Amino acid sequence: MREKELIVYRDFEDGELLYDMAFLMSHYDDEYYNTEDMAALFYECIHDLIDLAGNYGFHGNLWHCYLANLLVNNENSYSCGCEILGEIAGSINDAALHDICIFKEFYDFDFAPMMEILKVPEFSLIENYASSMQESKVYNKRICARICELAEKFCADGTAEDMKSTLTQFYKEYGVGKFGLHKSFRITHDEEGVHIVPILNIAHVKLDDLVGYELPKKKLVDNTEAFVNGKKANNCLLFGDAGTGKSSSIKAIANEYYDRGLRIIEVYKHQFQDLNTVISQIKNRNYKFIIYMDDLSFEEFEIEYKYLKAVIEGGLEKKPENVLIYATSNRRHLIRENYSDKEETREDMHTSDTVQEKLSLVYRFGVTIYFGAPNKKEFQNIVKTLAERYHVEMPEEELLLEANKWELSHGGLSGRSAQQFIDYLLGK
């Protein structure tokens, strides 16, 4: 096998299995090696494939799924160039085709002679593997299904050129690596630096699930539509009362625009100093990124807002056109302002400058969207809509009476308290 001749596709995650299998394919009938040792290595490879199936949720031909997964996750000059955009021009295509030819050889390898010589009939276990249907540790069911489907498509490809075309189409439709497969991400920081890691399971909420708030939702959609279409768009601040659907709206945006190349990266306040590093990792990718900050607010002694202002303003370097910042907050003005800020007896001689600095952060958001608490009539409409959606059977008069009792002791009139009331009824 020619695994050492790979040019573009290298440095695979979980790549050790590939090299072990390549060694077996090349030397299983070599008299120089002990047959029992080779069989032991083969069993170890079978174990690794089944272990990967458990972690990733693969089913069917596990060897084919493994190879497809390597190709889908390998970020290189060819795959990153093709993500979202499709086929690219240049000599890189020849280098990529060279590598796909090698993968085609791996894909079409006939294991029957190896199984006979090494006396390993158990290989049939991984040719038609049935998964436990449990949620995998690495992929959700949507991602797992796409990779297994890609593995099946490769089986129908007669040539390496066909296989390359199928793979390139996958890159165009979904992308490559973690950004291609996942919708949402968070930031981790360790001794090796800042990492953007996938959020495996997010709520499958849609904007239509949020009852009412048609004007705020339209304003949010219009700005996001412009962004994913490559037009000018603004950083966006969603503010207003607690429980009114601000965070749910952001989650809905992540779900509804994923197929059009939108990705969400959640950043917490203590991570603002890492924002420049995060942006440097995503600015040259062919996706649109929203950096999302939930429940954003600052006390008077906190200075993290200065990192955020610096990032939004961009400094000398032009802000990437594929990055926006969306934030939610219960405050219209994000930084707490005290009366003492306006007292002339303060040590700061330029009092107005101090006040303006604290107020200026909100002005960095070109679009501000207000989510107000519903009135009694709107709250009751939310309750009735949710009750119908979840098939709650209760006379309307009794339903609304109980809902009114519920909101009095559970945070007042809001979409959240309405949903909690319906959840309470469903759990009885």
Give the location of each predicted region.
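Conserved AAA+ ATPase "SRH/arginine-finger" region at the nucleotide-binding site
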Residues: 346-359, 366-380
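Conserved catalytic/switch belt of AAA+ P-loop NTPases
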Residues: 299-349, 353
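AAA+ P-loop ATPase mechanoenzymes
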Residues: 1-209
